[in-house]
């Protein structure tokens, strides 16, 4: 799913350093499984899990991870994706005492730590994802606090997206008509390319 893109260079670097790499790709459905070919090229084994069973095996990422833990000696785990998924992977790996790195995707506004939107608690201390992370020891992250903070604007986001959608479609339709309006075509024909690019914008 969403964590595959940032995970790919990590997998490639681990493999290049001579590690045995087992990758568990997971998503809600087949359409959300991306970069499979690239992951296979840099992994010794790839397990694919989908929530609906439309591709690979039906189940959650934690099921695939636990299967690997039970049959292999796992020295390190990396988890990148939705916060809830990272939380449960970390709970699982903590049980087996496997160090786990996560890459957090909290709300970030200014990228300097000034706004505090990305504030989290790691090992009982306040950290800012934008300046202290985004990678952290997953066993130290207070995921419950993080999930609560990330959900603070969900209702407002849903309301705004609902308002925005019809407007976007209308704007797109209007833009298409406006872009190819007869008066614009006449103007384009009457001007040489250099004259068109010289118009102050």
Kindly give the residue locations of the regions a language model identified.
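Short acidic, glycine/serine/threonine-rich loops at helix termini
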Residues: 90, 113, 141-142
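Local cysteine-cluster metal-coordination motifs and their immediate loop/turn environment
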Residues: 4-6, 83-84, 105-135, 163-172
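Short C-terminal domain-edge/linker segments immediately following a structured domain
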Residues: 53-57, 77-80, 108-111, 131-134, ...
């Amino acid at each position: 799913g969403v964590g595959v893109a940032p995970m790919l260079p990590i997998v490639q670097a681990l493999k290049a350093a001579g590690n045995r790499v087992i990758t568990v790709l997971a998503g809600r459905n087949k359409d959300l499984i991306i970069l499979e070919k690239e992951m296979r090229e840099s992994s010794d084994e790839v397990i694919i899990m989908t929530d609906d069973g439309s591709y690979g095996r039906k189940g959650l990422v934690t099921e695939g991870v636990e299967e690997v833990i039970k049959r292999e000696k796992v020295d390190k785990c990396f988890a990148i994706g939705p916060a809830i998924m990272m939380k449960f992977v970390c709970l699982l790996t903590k049980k087996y005492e496997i160090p786990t790195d996560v890459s957090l995707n909290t709300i970030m506004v200014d990228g300097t730590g000034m706004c505090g939107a990305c504030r989290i608690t790691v090992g009982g201390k306040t950290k800012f994802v934008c300046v202290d992370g985004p990678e952290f020891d997953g066993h130290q992250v207070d995921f419950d606090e993080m999930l609560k903070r990330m959900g603070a604007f969900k209702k407002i986001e849903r309301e705004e997206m609902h308002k925005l959608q019809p407007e976007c479609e209308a704007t797109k339709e209007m833009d298409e008509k406006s872009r190819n309006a007869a008066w614009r075509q006449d103007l384009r024909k009457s001007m040489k390319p250099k004259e068109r690019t010289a118009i102050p914008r």
